[in-house]
């Protein structure tokens, strides 16, 4: 994955001087008079959740001295088909498809396609009335029922492909309402995973978490009207330029005092342990299973530069957990996963940089100029992109996952 310095990015984006956004409702750009009323646009994503957006709109018309979008309508006017009634219904939560783009003049990126879900007007005692409209990625419509399920010895794309075939035990209907398309080339390069569990999750939320874990994307691909029998489907796989509103697969390099506006890391040893033991039961032999993973194992390379500090803090020697595992290999892999998850929580950070539409949850970022303990490679868990009165900024939360920690 290429590493991009923000000075090079600045040249491509004309110095980040002209941020721009675009809102389309049912395929049409919002009218210019509505566009001028948009005070702020925000997009949020999280590596475990469906992404969302928020618009803050001026809700006062000084020419008529009345509310513009919410607050002046009548039950009768809402049933009419006039320009005024259409404006009153413009931001109603419903099935209208909304496309949000953000970026810079000449280079806008699709952040999401979604639906309005919430209207929140503000009628203050002083100051201008505003309307805040929130929405979710169109994928939220696929949240139907939560399931518990598990796969053994499968690749992520195989899991996605199989999920599309599963049926609900009570209704007999397919659990997932759309066919799922995977990338066969990506499948051939994926590692086989011994055990993956869906734990009381919506299928779409489970798929999103698996996709972001691998740096993949998920999107709804509309039916091709030129192809007979073509149908709407869900794509699970790597971003492909020209096929989807894709993002560049890049790692940004951000340096304190140059490209980082602020950076607030937290280092904690409170919940760290030296080893994890997983107990299970071998159904074939009828014997108990016990496997252990330790930080002394050579495979634990993330944040290894902090292990010396951890040893001085005398972390708990061990945690023992009972897990639904049935082979020694499953128990070993589960112990490794638990210990690795603990290890990743040692250093977390929140930060702000200039607006970067390609900086998303599930991607990596290199932090430099903050010393040996806090410089390094971070995995982004959440981002918030905002275009408003202060220009375009991207705020993100991340956890340090440095391989050796050589950066300073």
Residue ranges and their predicted role:
Residues 64, 69-178, 195-196:
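Surface-exposed cap/loop segments at beta↔alpha junctions
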Residues 1-93, 131-140, 305-408:
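Juxtamembrane "anchor/assembly" segments of surface/extracellular structural proteins
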Residues 127-255:
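Charged- and aromatic-enriched interaction segments used to assemble
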Residues 116, 278, 380-382:
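Conserved hydrophobic positions within beta-strands
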